[in-house]
Amino acid sequence: MKKLLFTGLFAALIVACFAQKPYKVVFYNFENLFDTIRNPEIYDEEFTPEGPKKWNTPKYTKKINNLSRVLFDIAAINKDYPVVIGVSEIENRNVMEDVIATPKLAPANYRIVHYDSPDARGVDVAFYYRPDVFKLEGSAPIPFTMESLPNFRTRDVVTMWGTIDGEPFYFMVAHWPSRLGGKEASAPKRERAAEIMRHAADSVLAINPATKVVMMGDFNDDATDKSITEVLGAEGNIRKLQPGGYYNPFIDMLKAGIGSLAYRDQWNLFDNIVVSENLATGSTGSLKLERAPKGKYYGNIFRAPYLFQQEGQYKGYPLRTFVGNNFQGGYSDHLPVFIYIGECQSQYWLRLNISHRAQTT
Protein backbone atom coordinates (compact mmCIF):
# COMPACT_ATOMS: atom_id res chain seq x y z
CA MET A 1 0.00 0.00 0.00
CA LYS A 2 1.29 3.43 -0.85
CA LYS A 3 0.69 6.54 1.18
CA LEU A 4 1.42 10.07 0.09
CA LEU A 5 3.19 12.01 2.81
CA PHE A 6 3.04 15.77 2.42
CA THR A 7 6.05 17.65 3.72
CA GLY A 8 7.00 21.29 3.61
CA LEU A 9 3.41 22.44 3.30
CA PHE A 10 3.19 26.20 3.63
CA ALA A 11 1.22 29.08 2.34
CA ALA A 12 2.59 32.45 1.33
CA LEU A 13 0.32 35.43 1.24
CA ILE A 14 1.36 37.73 -1.59
CA VAL A 15 0.19 41.32 -1.61
CA ALA A 16 0.31 43.44 -4.73
CA CYS A 17 -0.44 47.15 -4.76
CA PHE A 18 -1.37 48.90 -7.96
CA ALA A 19 -2.72 52.26 -8.97
CA GLN A 20 -6.17 52.73 -10.40
CA LYS A 21 -7.86 55.86 -11.75
CA PRO A 22 -4.97 58.23 -10.95
CA TYR A 23 -6.19 61.70 -10.06
CA LYS A 24 -4.18 64.79 -10.95
CA VAL A 25 -3.67 67.73 -8.59
CA VAL A 26 -2.24 70.82 -10.31
CA PHE A 27 -0.77 74.15 -9.31
CA TYR A 28 -0.36 76.93 -11.87
CA ASN A 29 0.73 80.54 -11.45
CA PHE A 30 -1.49 82.35 -13.98
CA GLU A 31 0.87 85.36 -14.10
CA ASN A 32 -1.18 88.51 -13.68
CA LEU A 33 -4.59 87.37 -14.82
CA PHE A 34 -6.38 90.72 -14.56
CA ASP A 35 -9.58 91.81 -16.21
CA THR A 36 -9.56 95.08 -18.17
CA ILE A 37 -11.71 97.05 -15.72
CA ARG A 38 -10.14 99.62 -13.42
CA ASN A 39 -10.65 98.84 -9.74
CA PRO A 40 -9.92 101.92 -7.59
CA GLU A 41 -9.38 99.76 -4.50
CA ILE A 42 -6.24 98.06 -5.88
CA TYR A 43 -3.21 98.97 -7.96
CA ASP A 44 -4.28 97.54 -11.30
CA GLU A 45 -3.76 100.59 -13.54
CA GLU A 46 -1.20 98.86 -15.77
CA PHE A 47 -3.76 96.18 -16.68
CA THR A 48 -6.30 98.55 -18.19
CA PRO A 49 -6.72 99.83 -21.76
CA GLU A 50 -5.32 103.20 -20.66
CA GLY A 51 -2.35 101.72 -18.79
CA PRO A 52 1.19 101.14 -20.06
CA LYS A 53 0.38 97.59 -21.17
CA LYS A 54 -2.68 98.68 -23.16
CA TRP A 55 -4.51 95.71 -21.65
CA ASN A 56 -7.67 95.26 -23.70
CA THR A 57 -10.31 92.66 -24.51
CA PRO A 58 -8.43 90.93 -27.39
CA LYS A 59 -5.32 90.51 -25.22
CA TYR A 60 -7.39 89.34 -22.27
CA THR A 61 -9.25 86.81 -24.42
CA LYS A 62 -5.95 85.51 -25.79
CA LYS A 63 -4.68 85.03 -22.24
CA ILE A 64 -7.85 83.22 -21.14
CA ASN A 65 -7.70 80.84 -24.11
CA ASN A 66 -4.00 80.20 -23.53
CA LEU A 67 -4.53 79.19 -19.91
CA SER A 68 -7.49 77.03 -20.90
CA ARG A 69 -5.33 75.27 -23.48
CA VAL A 70 -2.66 74.44 -20.91
CA LEU A 71 -5.11 72.97 -18.41
CA PHE A 72 -6.87 71.01 -21.14
CA ASP A 73 -3.58 69.57 -22.36
CA ILE A 74 -2.68 68.52 -18.82
CA ALA A 75 -6.06 66.78 -18.68
CA ALA A 76 -5.31 65.05 -21.98
CA ILE A 77 -2.24 63.32 -20.54
CA ASN A 78 -4.43 60.60 -19.05
CA LYS A 79 -7.75 61.73 -20.54
CA ASP A 80 -9.06 62.98 -17.21
CA TYR A 81 -9.53 66.54 -15.97
CA PRO A 82 -7.50 67.40 -12.85
CA VAL A 83 -9.48 66.94 -9.66
CA VAL A 84 -8.02 70.01 -7.95
CA ILE A 85 -6.23 72.99 -9.50
CA GLY A 86 -4.63 75.62 -7.31
CA VAL A 87 -3.91 78.96 -8.97
CA SER A 88 -2.18 82.22 -8.09
CA GLU A 89 -1.99 85.77 -9.47
CA ILE A 90 -5.68 86.07 -10.29
CA GLU A 91 -7.47 89.38 -9.77
CA ASN A 92 -10.92 88.11 -8.85
CA ARG A 93 -13.49 85.38 -9.17
CA ASN A 94 -14.71 86.70 -12.53
CA VAL A 95 -11.44 85.98 -14.33
CA MET A 96 -11.45 82.46 -12.88
CA GLU A 97 -14.95 81.91 -14.22
CA ASP A 98 -13.89 83.07 -17.68
CA VAL A 99 -11.16 80.41 -17.80
CA ILE A 100 -13.46 77.51 -16.99
CA ALA A 101 -16.23 78.80 -19.25
CA THR A 102 -14.08 78.09 -22.31
CA PRO A 103 -15.15 75.14 -24.50
CA LYS A 104 -12.07 73.15 -23.51
CA LEU A 105 -12.79 73.27 -19.77
CA ALA A 106 -16.56 73.66 -19.51
CA PRO A 107 -17.16 69.86 -19.64
CA ALA A 108 -15.25 69.46 -16.35
CA ASN A 109 -17.97 71.40 -14.50
CA TYR A 110 -15.39 72.99 -12.19
CA ARG A 111 -16.35 74.84 -9.04
CA ILE A 112 -14.36 77.66 -7.42
CA VAL A 113 -13.07 78.42 -3.92
CA HIS A 114 -11.86 82.03 -3.79
CA TYR A 115 -11.46 84.81 -1.24
CA ASP A 116 -10.38 88.40 -1.87
CA SER A 117 -7.04 88.98 -0.18
CA PRO A 118 -5.53 92.20 1.21
CA ASP A 119 -2.69 92.18 -1.34
CA ALA A 120 -2.11 95.74 -2.60
CA ARG A 121 -2.06 94.66 -6.26
CA GLY A 122 -5.25 92.72 -5.73
CA VAL A 123 -3.87 89.34 -6.77
CA ASP A 124 -5.29 86.30 -5.00
CA VAL A 125 -4.89 82.54 -4.78
CA ALA A 126 -7.79 80.16 -5.28
CA PHE A 127 -8.91 76.66 -6.20
CA TYR A 128 -10.83 74.95 -8.95
CA TYR A 129 -12.23 71.55 -8.03
CA ARG A 130 -14.35 68.86 -9.63
CA PRO A 131 -17.45 68.30 -7.49
CA ASP A 132 -17.97 64.82 -8.91
CA VAL A 133 -14.73 63.67 -7.24
CA PHE A 134 -13.82 66.12 -4.49
CA LYS A 135 -16.73 66.48 -2.08
CA LEU A 136 -16.24 69.92 -0.56
CA GLU A 137 -17.12 70.25 3.11
CA GLY A 138 -15.72 73.69 3.87
CA SER A 139 -13.19 76.39 3.08
CA ALA A 140 -11.52 79.38 4.74
CA PRO A 141 -8.73 81.90 4.23
CA ILE A 142 -5.81 82.12 6.64
CA PRO A 143 -4.41 85.68 6.81
CA PHE A 144 -0.69 86.39 6.83
CA THR A 145 0.38 87.96 10.11
CA MET A 146 3.88 88.85 11.29
CA GLU A 147 4.49 90.42 14.68
CA SER A 148 7.55 92.37 13.55
CA LEU A 149 5.68 93.75 10.50
CA PRO A 150 2.13 94.44 11.71
CA ASN A 151 1.23 96.55 8.65
CA PHE A 152 2.58 94.18 6.01
CA ARG A 153 -0.14 92.82 3.72
CA THR A 154 0.09 89.96 1.27
CA ARG A 155 -1.96 87.09 -0.11
CA ASP A 156 -3.97 84.90 2.27
CA VAL A 157 -3.52 81.16 2.34
CA VAL A 158 -6.74 79.64 0.98
CA THR A 159 -7.80 76.31 2.44
CA MET A 160 -10.52 73.83 1.57
CA TRP A 161 -11.39 70.44 2.95
CA GLY A 162 -13.56 67.51 2.01
CA THR A 163 -13.27 63.95 0.77
CA ILE A 164 -12.03 62.04 -2.26
CA ASP A 165 -13.37 58.51 -2.49
CA GLY A 166 -14.50 58.87 1.11
CA GLU A 167 -11.03 59.76 2.41
CA PRO A 168 -10.49 63.13 4.18
CA PHE A 169 -8.34 65.72 2.39
CA TYR A 170 -7.19 69.19 3.40
CA PHE A 171 -5.83 71.45 0.63
CA MET A 172 -3.90 74.70 0.99
CA VAL A 173 -2.78 77.09 -1.75
CA ALA A 174 -0.47 80.04 -1.19
CA HIS A 175 1.65 82.67 -2.89
CA TRP A 176 4.38 83.53 -0.43
CA PRO A 177 5.91 87.03 -0.22
CA SER A 178 8.27 87.95 -3.04
CA ARG A 179 12.04 88.40 -2.96
CA LEU A 180 11.67 92.17 -3.30
CA GLY A 181 14.64 93.72 -1.50
CA GLY A 182 16.77 90.61 -1.99
CA LYS A 183 16.46 86.93 -1.15
CA GLU A 184 18.10 87.09 2.28
CA ALA A 185 16.48 90.33 3.41
CA SER A 186 13.01 89.09 2.48
CA ALA A 187 13.49 85.50 3.71
CA PRO A 188 11.84 86.06 7.14
CA LYS A 189 8.53 86.84 5.42
CA ARG A 190 8.55 83.56 3.52
CA GLU A 191 9.64 81.67 6.60
CA ARG A 192 6.69 83.15 8.45
CA ALA A 193 4.38 82.07 5.61
CA ALA A 194 5.81 78.56 5.88
CA GLU A 195 5.25 78.61 9.63
CA ILE A 196 1.59 79.55 9.13
CA MET A 197 1.02 76.68 6.70
CA ARG A 198 2.90 74.17 8.84
CA HIS A 199 0.86 75.12 11.91
CA ALA A 200 -2.39 74.69 9.97
CA ALA A 201 -1.31 71.29 8.62
CA ASP A 202 -0.15 70.04 12.02
CA SER A 203 -3.41 71.18 13.61
CA VAL A 204 -5.48 69.28 11.05
CA LEU A 205 -3.46 66.10 11.54
CA ALA A 206 -3.66 66.41 15.32
CA ILE A 207 -7.46 66.30 15.06
CA ASN A 208 -7.54 63.47 12.52
CA PRO A 209 -4.25 61.74 11.63
CA ALA A 210 -5.96 60.06 8.66
CA THR A 211 -6.47 63.40 6.88
CA LYS A 212 -4.32 63.73 3.78
CA VAL A 213 -2.80 67.20 3.54
CA VAL A 214 -1.73 68.87 0.29
CA MET A 215 0.11 72.21 0.43
CA MET A 216 0.79 73.93 -2.89
CA GLY A 217 1.75 77.27 -4.31
CA ASP A 218 4.32 79.67 -5.64
CA PHE A 219 6.55 79.81 -2.59
CA ASN A 220 9.06 82.30 -4.09
CA ASP A 221 11.74 80.00 -2.72
CA ASP A 222 13.32 76.94 -4.22
CA ALA A 223 12.33 73.49 -3.02
CA THR A 224 15.69 73.19 -1.20
CA ASP A 225 15.54 76.54 0.61
CA LYS A 226 15.25 76.80 4.40
CA SER A 227 11.65 78.03 4.37
CA ILE A 228 10.52 74.79 2.73
CA THR A 229 12.93 72.16 4.08
CA GLU A 230 13.24 73.40 7.67
CA VAL A 231 10.28 75.65 8.50
CA LEU A 232 7.63 73.86 6.46
CA GLY A 233 9.52 70.65 7.22
CA ALA A 234 9.28 69.12 3.74
CA GLU A 235 11.49 66.05 3.34
CA GLY A 236 12.96 65.18 -0.06
CA ASN A 237 13.55 61.49 0.66
CA ILE A 238 10.34 59.49 0.86
CA ARG A 239 12.15 56.67 2.69
CA LYS A 240 13.03 58.99 5.57
CA LEU A 241 9.47 60.12 6.22
CA GLN A 242 8.12 59.77 9.72
CA PRO A 243 4.42 59.71 10.69
CA GLY A 244 3.17 63.28 10.74
CA GLY A 245 5.91 64.43 8.37
CA TYR A 246 5.70 66.05 4.93
CA TYR A 247 7.18 65.14 1.56
CA ASN A 248 8.16 67.44 -1.30
CA PRO A 249 8.45 65.45 -4.56
CA PHE A 250 10.04 68.43 -6.33
CA ILE A 251 13.29 68.49 -4.34
CA ASP A 252 14.85 65.72 -6.42
CA MET A 253 13.78 67.48 -9.60
CA LEU A 254 15.47 70.73 -8.60
CA LYS A 255 18.65 68.85 -7.69
CA ALA A 256 18.59 67.40 -11.21
CA GLY A 257 18.46 70.90 -12.68
CA ILE A 258 14.75 70.85 -13.53
CA GLY A 259 12.73 73.96 -12.74
CA SER A 260 9.41 75.74 -13.20
CA LEU A 261 10.70 79.24 -13.98
CA ALA A 262 13.90 80.75 -15.34
CA TYR A 263 15.79 83.83 -14.21
CA ARG A 264 19.18 85.01 -15.43
CA ASP A 265 19.80 81.77 -17.30
CA GLN A 266 19.11 79.64 -14.24
CA TRP A 267 16.15 77.41 -13.48
CA ASN A 268 14.33 77.83 -10.18
CA LEU A 269 11.60 75.69 -8.70
CA PHE A 270 9.34 78.01 -6.72
CA ASP A 271 6.18 76.07 -7.59
CA ASN A 272 5.77 73.23 -5.12
CA ILE A 273 3.23 70.65 -4.02
CA VAL A 274 3.98 69.21 -0.59
CA VAL A 275 2.01 66.27 0.82
CA SER A 276 1.61 64.65 4.21
CA GLU A 277 3.36 61.38 4.99
CA ASN A 278 0.16 59.33 4.87
CA LEU A 279 -0.48 60.47 1.30
CA ALA A 280 3.13 59.98 0.25
CA THR A 281 3.33 56.43 1.59
CA GLY A 282 -0.29 55.29 1.72
CA SER A 283 -0.01 54.55 5.43
CA THR A 284 -3.70 55.40 5.91
CA GLY A 285 -6.55 54.66 3.53
CA SER A 286 -6.05 53.56 -0.07
CA LEU A 287 -5.16 56.80 -1.88
CA LYS A 288 -1.46 57.57 -2.21
CA LEU A 289 1.04 59.56 -4.23
CA GLU A 290 2.00 57.84 -7.48
CA ARG A 291 4.57 58.33 -10.19
CA ALA A 292 3.47 58.97 -13.73
CA PRO A 293 3.61 55.87 -15.95
CA LYS A 294 7.32 55.32 -16.63
CA GLY A 295 8.02 58.45 -14.57
CA LYS A 296 11.23 58.96 -12.61
CA TYR A 297 9.87 61.47 -10.10
CA TYR A 298 6.75 61.79 -7.97
CA GLY A 299 6.53 65.43 -9.05
CA ASN A 300 5.67 66.53 -12.58
CA ILE A 301 6.22 69.75 -14.53
CA PHE A 302 4.20 70.31 -17.70
CA ARG A 303 6.69 71.27 -20.40
CA ALA A 304 4.81 71.41 -23.71
CA PRO A 305 7.01 73.03 -26.41
CA TYR A 306 4.54 75.86 -27.00
CA LEU A 307 5.10 77.07 -23.42
CA PHE A 308 8.64 78.19 -24.26
CA GLN A 309 10.23 81.07 -26.14
CA GLN A 310 11.45 79.69 -29.46
CA GLU A 311 13.90 82.44 -30.37
CA GLY A 312 15.59 85.63 -29.26
CA GLN A 313 17.29 86.64 -26.03
CA TYR A 314 14.97 84.53 -23.90
CA LYS A 315 14.94 81.41 -26.05
CA GLY A 316 14.16 78.41 -23.85
CA TYR A 317 12.48 80.51 -21.15
CA PRO A 318 8.76 80.16 -20.39
CA LEU A 319 6.76 82.21 -22.90
CA ARG A 320 5.13 84.90 -20.80
CA THR A 321 2.32 87.32 -21.54
CA PHE A 322 4.49 90.44 -21.48
CA VAL A 323 8.18 91.30 -21.50
CA GLY A 324 8.07 94.72 -19.94
CA ASN A 325 5.12 96.36 -21.64
CA ASN A 326 5.58 94.43 -24.88
CA PHE A 327 2.80 91.91 -25.44
CA GLN A 328 4.17 88.44 -26.23
CA GLY A 329 0.87 86.59 -26.37
CA GLY A 330 2.26 83.88 -24.13
CA TYR A 331 1.06 81.88 -21.17
CA SER A 332 2.94 82.51 -17.92
CA ASP A 333 6.44 83.03 -16.60
CA HIS A 334 5.88 79.84 -14.59
CA LEU A 335 5.28 76.29 -15.75
CA PRO A 336 2.43 74.30 -14.16
CA VAL A 337 3.31 71.53 -11.73
CA PHE A 338 1.24 68.52 -10.76
CA ILE A 339 1.11 65.21 -8.92
CA TYR A 340 -0.79 61.95 -9.35
CA ILE A 341 -2.85 60.36 -6.61
CA GLY A 342 -3.70 56.72 -7.21
CA GLU A 343 -5.84 54.17 -5.46
CA CYS A 344 -3.79 51.42 -3.92
CA GLN A 345 -5.71 48.16 -3.77
CA SER A 346 -4.53 44.81 -2.52
CA GLN A 347 -4.84 41.46 -4.21
CA TYR A 348 -4.00 38.22 -2.54
CA TRP A 349 -2.82 34.91 -3.88
CA LEU A 350 -2.31 31.74 -1.90
CA ARG A 351 0.79 29.92 -3.00
CA LEU A 352 1.13 26.33 -1.86
CA ASN A 353 4.50 24.67 -1.95
CA ILE A 354 3.99 20.96 -1.54
CA SER A 355 6.54 18.22 -1.65
CA HIS A 356 5.50 14.61 -1.45
CA ARG A 357 7.04 11.22 -1.44
CA ALA A 358 5.59 7.79 -1.77
CA GLN A 359 5.94 5.38 1.09
CA THR A 360 5.21 1.67 0.79
CA THR A 361 3.71 -0.14 3.73
Question: Where are the model-predicted features located?
Answer:
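Structural recognition of the beta-strand scaffold that forms the well-ordered cores
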Residues: 24-27, 83-88, 111-114, 125-129, ...
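Sec-exported extracytoplasmic/periplasmic mature domains
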Residues: 72-76, 92-105, 133, 198-209, ...
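Second-shell loop/turn segments in exported
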Residues: 49-60, 81-87, 114-115, 146-148, ...
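N-terminal, active-site-proximal structural segment of metallo-dependent hydrolase catalytic domains
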Residues: 18-103, 113-125, 297-300, 310-315, ...
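Bacterial Sec-dependent N-terminal signal peptides
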Residues: 1-22, 361
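Metal-dependent phosphoester-hydrolase catalytic domains
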Residues: 203-213, 221-353
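Extracytoplasmic, non-cytosolic globular domains
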Residues: 114, 158-253
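Structured beta-strand-rich core segments of catalytic domains in phosphoester-bond hydrolases
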Residues: 90-170, 174-176
